[in-house]
């Protein structure tokens, strides 16, 4: 039985997030520990970390994953932007360490005009530098997320994530989160039973299923192979419901924390969590009727 949850708001401080997760039935959750669209970072206030840990225990939240800022580009070719990106991810790592958050999810980056090989080399070198700078933070798993393949982003193909991992000095500090909408946009045909199996076979061949630490559960508005990142409500997009039934029952994924980033909003996430939990229990519940609130994560 997987832990099932969603990306919840940390408005008012990260210690507020577990209560919000508990209110919608989360077993696990994802959050931003900082303003994800600003380079400026407020320090963790005195008592905030202890309050977060207490709230997490009180509301029965299992796995917690922080999503790093969207501004970070570890493949940036501009020296100033690259330095800011490395500093920002190091700050995210420090915050997770302080709060006791065990998973730090991030997008690898975009190579711009440098080319995919140069992008992979830069990303890996930056991650190696971060780990050397923070040898005491092995309690936080650095989680590479696959991307949809828009523009010059790195990591749409599992082989690209594998190439980054192969260049790491401390690969044991890293894991991978697969976003279903991103994988679909990148061309993995997970909407069919055969395509679902083929996707995980490819993942195992390139990366190894032992490195899979979480799933982002999102349906997709655009069709397979679109290279466009636009999430849809569970079962209401181009992927359809069967892939999500598989996600919560397939032995390869059923033990993982699985987190929603759909445009449903908190009330809708509660219904999607109930539906997924019913599927995980072997039932065949009807898809809930949910308003698309255009929440973008």
UniProtKB/Swiss-Prot annotation:
It comes from the Bacteria. PROSITE patterns: AP_NUCLEASE_F2_1 (PS00729), AP_NUCLEASE_F2_3 (PS00731), AP_NUCLEASE_F2_4 (PS51432). Zn(2+) 1 binds at residues 67, 107, 145. Its cofactor is Zn(2+). Binds 3 Zn(2+) ions. Residues 1-21 are annotated as: Disordered. Zn(2+) 2 binds at residues 145, 179, 216, 261. The keyword Transcription does not apply. It catalyses: Endonucleolytic cleavage to 5'-phosphooligonucleotide end-products. Its EC number is 3.1.21.2. It is an enzyme of class 3 (hydrolase). Zn(2+) 3 binds at residues 182, 229, 231. Endonuclease IV plays a role in DNA repair. It cleaves phosphodiester bonds at apurinic or apyrimidinic (AP) sites, generating a 3'-hydroxyl group and a 5'-terminal sugar phosphate. Belongs to the AP endonuclease 2 family. This is Probable endonuclease 4. It comes from Halorhodospira halophila (strain DSM 244 / SL1).
């Amino acid at each position: 039985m997987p832990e099932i949850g969603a990306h919840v708001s940390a408005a008012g401080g990260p210690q507020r997030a577990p209560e919000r997760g508990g209110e919608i039935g989360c077993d696990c959750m994802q959050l931003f520990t900082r303003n994800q669209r600003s380079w400026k970072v407020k320090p963790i206030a005195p008592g905030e970390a202890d309050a977060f840990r207490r709230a997490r225990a009180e509301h029965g939240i299992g796995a917690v994953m922080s999503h790093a800022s969207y501004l970070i580009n570890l493949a940036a070719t501009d020296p100033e932007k690259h330095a800011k990106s490395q500093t920002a991810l190091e700050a995210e790592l420090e915050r997770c360490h302080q709060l006791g958050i065990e998973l730090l999810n991030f997008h690898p980056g975009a190579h711009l005009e440098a080319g995919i090989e140069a992008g992979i080399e830069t990303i890996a070198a930056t991650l190696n530098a971060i780990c050397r700078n923070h040898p005491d933070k092995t309690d936080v798993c650095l989680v590479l997320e696959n991307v949809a393949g828009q523009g010059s982003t790195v990591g749409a193909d599992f082989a690209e994530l594998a190439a980054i991992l192969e260049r790491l000095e401390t690969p044991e500090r890293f894991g991978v989160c697969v976003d279903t909408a991103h994988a679909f946009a990148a061309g993995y045909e997970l909407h069919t039973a055969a395509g679902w199996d083929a996707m995980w076979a490819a993942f195992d061949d390139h990366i190894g299923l032992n490195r899979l630490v979480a799933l982002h559960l999102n349906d997709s508005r655009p069709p397979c192979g679109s290279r466009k990142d636009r999430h849809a409500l569970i079962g209401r997009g181009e992927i359809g419901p069967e892939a999500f039934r598989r996600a919560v029952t397939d032995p390869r994924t059923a033990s993982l924390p699985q987190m929603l980033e759909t445009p449903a909003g908190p009330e809708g996430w509660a219904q999607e969590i109930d539906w997924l939990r019913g599927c995980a229990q072997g039932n065949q519940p009807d898809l809930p009727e949910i308003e698309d609130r255009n929440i973008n994560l």
